[in-house]
Structure formats: C-alpha cells, structure tokens
Amino acid sequence: MDKDWFEVSVITSSEAVEAVTGILYNTPVKGVAIEDSKDVEFKKKHPGDWDYFDESLLNVKDGAVIKAYYKDDHNFDESVKYIEESIDKLSEFGINKGEGKVFVNKVNETDWENNWKKYYKPTKIGARIVVKPLWEEYTPKDYELMLNMDPGMAFGTGTHETTRMCIQALERYVNEDAEVFDIGTGSGILAIAAAKLNAKKVLGVDLDSVAVKAAKENIQYNNVNNIEILHGNLMEVVQGKADIIVANIIADVINILIPDINKFLKTDGYFISSGIIKDRAEDVIENLKKNKFEIIEVNNQGEWICIVAKL
C-alpha cells in the first residue's frame, strides 16, 4: 500500500526561486519540483535547445510555484513553520517573495514519484552541455558533454537562468590549462561542468554540509576525478589561486566576496558571477570596478544578470 506524503507548494516570484529552494533544503525535504514562468518563456523562445519539454508547464503564469515533498512524520509541522517564517524574511535581503503563500496537500507515494520526476528532462544548457537527470535516457551527440545530476538533492539543476548563464560562460572561458574555483557550489553542477569542459583542476566550496554531500554524490555519477569539494568558506579552506572563479549566489554575498576574490584569482583571471537580479547589477559592477576588475561581459536572461570580469 502506498505511504502518505505531504506536498508543500510555495507560490513565489521567479526572482526568489533560488532563495526559496535553499530554504526548502534546510528542511528534511525528499524532492523539489520548480514550475517557473520565466523558464517557460525562455523555452518558447528557444525551442531548438530542448530535447524534451513537459507541455504541462505551459500552464504556469507569472512567477513560480515550487513544490516540495516530505514524509508524513512528527517533524513536518515544524518544517512548514520554518518555511513560512523564512519566506516572510526574504524581503529583508532585498528579495521579492511574490505572493509568498504556502499550501499543503497530502499525496501518496506513487503520486509523489510521478509529480516530482516529470519536471526534469534532459536539458541542453549551452553549446555543448546537456544536463540529464539520472533516471532519464539520453544519447549525446558527438560534440555534447552530458552531466548526470540528481535533482532530488540538488541546489542547481541547470534550468534556472543563473545556472544556465554561468555554464555558458564556462564554455567560453575554460580550457585544458584552467584551474577553476566554484564558490557556493550547491549541487556541484558548475564544478562538474568545468571538469567536463576539460579544466585542469576544479575546486568547489560550500558552507552547507548538505550541499557538499550532494555535490560529492553528483561527482560520482559523472566519473570525473579532477574535482575536490570542500566544506567551509573561501577565506578559510581554499589555498592557491585559480584562472577562473565562478559564484552563482546572490548580489549581497557577491559584493562581500569581491574584495577578497583578487587574493584567489591569478593575474588575467576571470570572475564569473550570477544570482544577480537586474536591479542590483550596477551595484555589483561598480564594486568590481572599484576593486580593479575590468568588465568583460554583462549577460541577462529573464530578470537575472551574469557578469564576467577580468582581473
């Protein structure tokens, strides 16, 4: 007999997707599905980039709906309270929570499996990178590089604009001599992409122990051995300098990092930063210039910005 699960639906803005997902992964969540109107809009404009596309997502209107799945246990009510309180605090960090409403439904185990997995299909991100969930079959073309990811535990699955732009930038700048640092690695998707692009050495760092565990497991699924994942912050656990540093976080954290980035970046090295909403782009750009960076690229998708700067 199927066991009961809880489905928690959060109605929010596209801007808050990454932040809300982070909140959910601070609870004992077993799976997350994201329905984002910005993703649907992008997919409609770029139909040739998608090998599969769930037509049910076309029903998504403005903003985003994030669905999370939990076992029916005594800790569930505490998780819901934490989610609601954390979403209410997003505005304190300059993040638009949208409606910020939380709804709870009971579903059986079979429904959870179907509801969660149907949103994740093989997705072409850049010119070469294809992100594939573990349970899907996909035969890459000769020029494609496939990333096997487990979205159930992931903090980044490749579908969000910020992740997509960072991967596209890595495609342009990574070469076989490059050493790459991924700050706030989450699921490890950017670190794995850099390794697949034949970087000499890749280092991923995250303050969240759950993210570190997820990244290490995703690395195993991809059979890459030139990656190291560390638990901690940039200043305390990283040694040496990189040719490329990538950080897909939020503008406030990036601005805090910028003065220290040049201590870890080689001369003529590149700093790729995203997780920046349009309204904060100039703030980050000015901070980069103040710290002796040259702005090479400013790219945007939806409401998000990705900046490539050179030291």
Swiss-Prot record:
The lineage of its organism: Bacteria, Bacillati, Bacillota, Clostridia, Eubacteriales. PANTHER family: ELECTRON TRANSFER FLAVOPROTEIN BETA SUBUNIT LYSINE METHYLTRANSFERASE. This is Ribosomal protein L11 methyltransferase. It comes from the Bacteria. Induction: By heat shock. InterPro entries: Ribosomal_L11_MeTrfase_PrmA, Ribosomal_PrmA_MeTrfase, SAM-dependent_MTases_sf. Its EC number is 2.1.1.-. Its main location: cytoplasm. S-adenosyl-L-methionine binds at T163, G184, D206, N248. It holds the Pfam family PrmA. GO terms for cellular component: cytoplasm.
